[in-house]
């Protein structure tokens, strides 16, 4: 027997007096397959290579800017 995970979504509309509550149940294997499908799409093939390159470039610039700011305050003349 698979474990069931449930979710409750509550939304309230400003213009009307009705509240909407929806409940869904999703098994852990369905949720895992959804995440696996997304990760395979984003981490493999040409799109995966592009994501890794963009992530590396973004990480480089973050470290560069933090180092520049740190160096500015460390070597600042008083």
Swiss-Prot record:
**PTM annotation (N-acetylmethionine): residues:** 1
Q: What ranges does the Extracellular topological domain annotation cover?
A: 70-78
Q: Where is this region: Disordered?
A: 1-22
What are the record keywords, sorted? Acetylation, Cell membrane, Disulfide bond, Membrane, Phosphoprotein, Signal-anchor, Transmembrane, Transmembrane helix
UniProt xrefs under InterPro entries: SMIM1
Q: Which ranges form a coiled coil?
A: none
Q: Any ranges marked Cytoplasmic in the topology annotation, and which? A: 1-48
Kindly report the protein's main subcellular placement as a broad class.
membrane
Which positions, given as ranges, span the membrane?
Answer: 49-69
Q: Where is the composition biased (Basic and acidic residues)?
A: 11-21
Q: Cellular component terms, GO, for this chain's entry?
A: cell surface; plasma membrane
Gene Ontology MF annotations = protein homodimerization activity
Q: How does it sit in the membrane?
A: Single-pass type II membrane protein
Entry keyword Transmembrane helix: yes
Compartments, record wording: Cell membrane
The PTM Phosphoserine maps to: 6, 17, 22, 27
Q: Which family does it belong to?
A: Belongs to the SMIM1 family.
Q: Which PANTHER family match?
A: SMALL INTEGRAL MEMBRANE PROTEIN 1
What job does the chain carry out? Regulator of red blood cell formation.
User: Quaternary structure?
Assistant: Homooligomer; disulfide-linked.
Question: Know the name of this protein?
Answer: Small integral membrane protein 1
């Amino acid at each position: 027997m698979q474990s069931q995970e449930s979710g409750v979504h509550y939304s309230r509309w400003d213009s009307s007096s009705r509240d909407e509550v929806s409940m869904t149940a999703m098994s852990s294997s369905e949720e895992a397959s959804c995440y696996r499908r997304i990760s395979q799409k984003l981490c493999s093939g040409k799109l995966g290579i592009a994501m890794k390159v963009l992530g590396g470039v973004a990480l480089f610039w973050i470290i560069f800017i933090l180092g520049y700011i740190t160096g500015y305050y460390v070597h600042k003349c008083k």
